[in-house]
Design a protein with these regions (language model features):
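Nucleotidyltransferase catalytic core that binds NTPs
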Residues: 1-184
C-alpha cells in the first residue's frame, strides 16, 4: 500500500491571509493530497522577532481563519492547523520539523510546500540541501522565481537531478533523489 501524501505549509502566518489558504487549497486539489498541515513557525531563524505575534496567537488566528462563518460555504476540510513547531526546540528549523513529522506520521508521505524564493535559498537553511532526503517538495512560482531559475537552482544544488518537461497541468518535476521529487 502506498502512503497517503500530506502537504505541509509552514510559515510565520504573521498574519494569516487568504493567499495562504488559497495556496494550500490549490495544492491539495491539484495533487490530490489527503490534507495540508498549516504549521506556524514558532521561532523563525531567518526573521527578526520584532513585530512577530506570539506563537499561540498566530495559531489561534489561523484556526479562526479556517472556521466557517454562519451562512457561508464550508471551508476546505483538507486544511488543518498543526502546532508541532511549538513542541520542538528553538529556533525552528524545517529539518527538525520534517524529521519529527515523519516519526509521528510513519504511514504517510510529506509534501513540503514552499515559494520559489525560499526554494532558491535552501542552501542558507539549516540542513536545507539535505531536505530532499526526507521530503518531497512543491515549489510555488512567484514573480521572481521563473522556470529558468527553478532549473538553475536544481542544477546548482543537485546536478544529478532529472527534470521533466511540463505536463498537461504545466507542472515541471525534478527527481532529486531516487525517492524524492520536486514539483514546480
Amino acid at each position: 500500500m502506498t502512503p497517503e501524501t500530506i502537504g505541509i505549509l509552514g510559515g510565520t502566518f504573521n498574519p494569516v491571509h487568504i493567499g495562504h489558504l488559497r495556496l494550500a487549497t490549490a495544492v491539495a486539489e491539484a495533487l490530490k493530497l489527503k490534507h495540508v498541515d498549516l504549521m506556524p513557525c514558532a521561532v523563525p531563524p531567518h526573521k527578526p522577532d520584532s513585530g512577530l505575534l506570539p506563537f499561540e496567537m498566530r495559531v489561534s488566528l489561523l484556526q479562526g481563519a479556517l472556521e466557517t462563518p454562519p451562512n457561508a460555504s464550508p471551508s476546505d476540510a483538507r486544511l488543518q492547523v498543526s502546532t508541532l513547531e511549538g513542541e520542538l526546540p528553538h529556533p525552528s528549523y524545517t529539518w527538525n520539523l520534517i524529521t519529527e513529522w515523519r516519526k509521528r506520521h510513519a504511514s504517510e508521505s510529506p509534501m513540503f510546500i514552499l515559494g520559489g524564493e525560499d526554494f532558491m535559498h535552501l542552501d542558507t537553511w539549516h540542513r536545507g540541501l539535505e531536505l530532499p532526503n526526507i521530503t518531497n517538495f512543491v515549489v510555488v512560482p512567484r514573480c521572481q522565481a521563473d522556470e529558468e531559475t527553478f532549473r538553475a537552482t536544481i542544477g546548482r544544488h543537485w546536478p544529478k537531478a532529472v527534470i521533466t518537461e511540463p505536463d498537461e497541468n504545466n507542472l515541471l518535476s525534478a527527481a532529486i533523489t531516487d525517492e524524492t521529487s520536486c514539483l514546480y
